[in-house]
Amino acid sequence: MSLLTTPSRTVSKPSTSERLIQAALEMFSVRGIAATTREIADAAGVNEVTLFRLFESKERLLGAVVQEVVQAESEALDRVDLEDFDIRRDIVAVAQVFYDTHHRYQAFLRTILAHRMNPKLTEEIVREAVQPLREKFIRYLAEGQRRGVIRENLDLRPTVDAFTGMIFAAVLRRAVYTPVYTSEAYLATCVDLFLNGICTRP
């Protein structure tokens, strides 16, 4: 066979774990934490035994769903090139990915926020899924401080939360009504406000 021959593409089927995570995402989006493992297993086309074999509990499955939700945001931070540090370019890219992710999963995020969860479960999910993402963002901003681009006296933990909060608020707002400005205009404003607030030379 010629080396230039284009191989036929095969589309791999989702694994059982992937099907369960997708089914859980859909069920949690509709029913919140009240969704049962039986409902999730049925939606994924597997039995409950398989669900428990792969994830042990509904709580661990919920954690896997949150991991899925934050994956794109984590990958966006992984793509940042610290050797070619350009804070405006990087923050614009990260803001867009964060907005797209929150918009894509807004039904899940709204429903989970509306349901009261066990505090220990919330703490575990934050520690295992959300905190690593925050730490990546904090490390990036710390590099900006090291380079003298970001104000040295800035506490980076609330800085990250303020940035993500602006974006999440926009997604929630657009779920209620459509503002007269575009999402692109809002994100550009968020980036300007953020950089003007944290940079030594905006």
Predicted regions and their residues:
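Amphipathic alpha-helical segments enriched in hydrophobic/aromatic and basic residues
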Residues: 28, 36-37, 58, 62-69, ...
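Basic, helix-initiating cap at the start of DNA-binding domains
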Residues: 1-34, 38-43, 49, 59-60
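Amphipathic alpha-helical packing segments from all-alpha helical-bundle domains
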Residues: 103-104, 120-147, 157-161, 188
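Amphipathic alpha-helical segments that line or abut small-molecule/effector binding pockets
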Residues: 22, 88-110, 157, 161, ...
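Amphipathic alpha-helical linker/stalk segments
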Residues: 65-94, 102
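Amphipathic C-terminal alpha-helical segment
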Residues: 100-101, 139-143, 160-181, 194-202
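Short helix-capping/turn signature of helix-turn-helix
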Residues: 55, 113-119, 129
